[in-house]
């Protein structure tokens, strides 16, 4: 059992999947503040909920007095991380990379404090293009390449799976692990970083950086990975029919972000409260153990607390109040027409186009499909983009589905 506050709380929250030497890292953290980093791939101009666990790990690290580094992959983005991908990433331009880095920095500022706000312990924003763009290929081979075993690299799960599926791996992508390892050593030299954190898919790359630094500099550094987050039904975290659940309000309205967390499956509530909120672990466990209608209150707390971290307390409470007005017996809902729906229809799973038919917002299946394709259809205030997306009793909010078309047509479907 670790003794340092960060590792103690990280373990209690379930944030630790693997760690290279937990006892030695614990000793280092007990001795004083350390510097740790997480890398971010600038392939989009916002982070999303799929990145949230490593962001929360950085946030927790900073809470306990350690300094985070947010490393932008401005150099490695020109190659692309092949980890567990079916095909090579499309190469992106320098202009797009710069735009995306600015957006990711804005995303991170919603969660952690940077050095321009707190010089003593604020996060450092680094960009690996600052050193990778200046590398000489011959020098890289002499300095770094000599320490890498091709047979070992072929054994990385991310590489092996691509090769086993006979999808190929370019030499460009194969070099990604070498450059990420170089990053760890460089951040150790420049900023004293002794810990790299990342998702479980980054384990091989992290260990390679530790090994390189030990071989060339004789230093002990550490790696820690967070678990892969899936829902209890096996769905990948942060993905929906609409795509990624973005953290920037310019990419996704705050209310929809709140709704994402409100729609958490019952079995995931306790786990997600520990992962994605600052509530005490004991409170997370108490809320997660609630059953029946009480679990819905826990989901609202999860939604409000997770949204408050990302968008601020005021915006989170405004989203919660909007939801209360719409879904609970308040003035907004009382004014909406209600249609009874045979419960057996939705219990078996009702396709989205049928939902709009049953609500009377479309006269036929074809019209309903066209309505959805046009982007004007919403269920529970979330845009429906897949006409065959199914809705079940689990999607009810206080006993109803709110079905909307445009800004003024709203119907409540109540299974009976």
Swiss-Prot record:
Motif placement: 'HIGH' region: 42-51
Catalysed conversion reaction: tRNA(Tyr) + L-tyrosine + ATP = L-tyrosyl-tRNA(Tyr) + AMP + diphosphate + H(+)
Localization in the cell: Cytoplasm
Residues forming coiled coils: none
Residues engaged in binding ATP: 239
Alphabetized Pfam families for the sequence: tRNA-synt_1b
Binding site for L-tyrosine: 37, 176, 180
Matching SUPFAM superfamilies: Alpha-L RNA-binding motif (SSF55174), Nucleotidylyl transferase (SSF52374)
E.C. designation(s): 6.1.1.1
Nucleotide-binding as UniProt keyword: yes
GO terms for biological process, alphabetical: tyrosyl-tRNA aminoacylation
Motif stretch ('KMSKS' region): 236-240
Residue ranges occupied by any S4 RNA-binding domain in the UniProt entry: 350-416
Signal among keywords: no
Family from the record: Belongs to the class-I aminoacyl-tRNA synthetase family. TyrS type 1 subfamily.
Assembly mode: Homodimer.
Name of this protein: Tyrosine--tRNA ligase
The organism of origin for this protein: Gluconobacter oxydans (strain 621H)
Lineage: Bacteria, Pseudomonadati, Pseudomonadota, Alphaproteobacteria, Acetobacterales
């Amino acid at each position: 059992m670790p003794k340092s506050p960060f590792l103690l709380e990280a373990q209690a929250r379930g944030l630790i999947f693997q760690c290279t030497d937990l006892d030695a890292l614990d000793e280092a953290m007990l001795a004083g503040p350390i510097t740790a980093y997480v890398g971010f791939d600038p392939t989009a101009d916002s982070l999303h909920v799929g990145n949230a666990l490593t962001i929360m790990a950085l946030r927790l690290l900073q809470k306990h007095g350690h300094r985070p580094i947010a490393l932008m992959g401005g150099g490695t983005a020109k190659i692309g991380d092949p980890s567990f991908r079916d095909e090579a990433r499309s190469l992106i331009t320098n202009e797009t990379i710069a735009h995306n880095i600015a957006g990711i920095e804005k995303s991170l500022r919603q969660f952690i404090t940077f050095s321009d706000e707190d010089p003593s312990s604020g996060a450092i924003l680094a960009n690996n293009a600052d050193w990778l763009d200046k590398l000489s290929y011959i020098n890289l081979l002499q300095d770094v390449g000599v320490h890498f075993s091709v047979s070992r690299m072929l054994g990385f799960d991310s590489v092996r799976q691509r090769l086993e599926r006979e999808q190929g791996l370019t030499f460009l992508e194969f070099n990604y692990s070498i450059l990420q390892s170089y990053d760890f050593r460089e951040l150790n030299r420049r900023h004293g970083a002794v810990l790299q954190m990342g998702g479980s898919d980054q384990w091989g790359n992290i260990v390679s950086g530790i090994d390189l630094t030990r071989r060339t500099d004789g230093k002990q550094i550490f790696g820690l990975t967070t678990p892969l987050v899936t829902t209890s039904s096996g769905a990948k975290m942060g993905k929906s029919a609409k795509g990624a659940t973005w953290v920037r309000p310019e990419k996704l309205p705050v209310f929809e972000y709140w709704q994402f967390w409100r729609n958490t499956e019952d079995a995931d509530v306790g786990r997600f409260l520990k992962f994605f909120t600052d509530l005490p672990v004991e409170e997370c466990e108490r809320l997660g153990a609630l059953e029946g209608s009480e679990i819905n209150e826990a989901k609202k707390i999860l939604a409000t607390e997770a949204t408050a971290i990302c968008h601020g307390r005021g915006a989170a409470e405004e989203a919660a109040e909007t939801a209360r007005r719409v879904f609970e017996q308040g003035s907004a809902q009382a004014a909406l027409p209600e249609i009874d729906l045979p419960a057996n229809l939705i219990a078996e799973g009702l396709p989205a186009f049928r939902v709009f038919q049953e609500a009377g917002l479309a006269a036929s299946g074809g019209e309903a499909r066209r309505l959805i394709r046009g982007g004007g259809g919403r269920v529970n205030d979330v845009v429906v983009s897949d006409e065959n997306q199914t809705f079940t009793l689990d999607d009810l909010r206080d006993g109803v589905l709110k079905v909307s078309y445009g800004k003024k047509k709203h119907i409540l479907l109540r299974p009976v």
